[in-house]
Amino acid sequence: YNLRTEVVNLFANGYVNYTTDYISQVTKMEDERLITTYANADKDLKTGVDLSLKVTPAKWFNFSVGANTYYVTTEGVFEGAHIDNRGWTNNSNLLLNFAPWKGGDIQVQYFVTTPQYYPQLTTSLTHQMNIGIKQRLLKGAMTVSVLLTDVFNTAKWEVWSHNNLFDLKDN
């Protein structure tokens, strides 16, 4: 669904993805090391919704909010161990875009990712802010940009797993 006016653009999309007999990344213990390989998995279901909203209240400023929320469930057996995992996940971002002078842009973007669910592994919630400045020169023939990523140093990514093959907590 898409609703568009001069000031507002709203987009919504729902989806369902069901896969059987597919190749999945799996991890196993071998000589006190974790080894990542690929194996046949039974099924994977992912269903969710994409939403985005862009508002342009002035020529020099716009903002957008985007979110992808979905439920994922994975089922399979690898070397006798279940590699099942399931949960709700959300990836969201907020973008503020300023055009304070001719040919220039300043962007501030904030990302939030809730825990992600993969076969055998779950990741932690992460968030970060990026700030970018861009200037177009020579009538747009050249662009100079600077991007500062993870401004507040908050993008700590943790992974954990508890299954029949190993227990893992990485932080």
What are these regions, as identified by a protein language model?
Residues 1, 12-18, 65-71, 108-112, ...:
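Transmembrane beta-barrel strands of outer-membrane/channel proteins
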Residues 1-5, 49-55, 94-98, 131-135, ...:
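Residues on the lipid-exposed face of transmembrane beta-strands in outer-membrane beta-barrel proteins
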Residues 3-66, 91:
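Outer membrane beta-barrel strand-and-loop segments of large Gram-negative receptors
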Residues 5-10, 59-63, 102-108, 137-144:
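Repeated loop/turn-to-beta-strand initiation elements of outer-membrane beta-barrel proteins
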Residues 14, 22-31, 36, 74-83, ...:
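Outer-membrane beta-barrel translocator domains and adjoining extracellular loop/strand segments
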Residues 16, 43-47, 84-92, 125-129, ...:
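Residues that define the transmembrane beta-barrel architecture of outer-membrane proteins
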Residues 69-74, 87-137, 160-161, 165:
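C-terminal beta-barrel architecture of Gram-negative outer-membrane proteins
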Residues 137-171:
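C-terminal beta-signal and adjacent terminal beta-strands/loops
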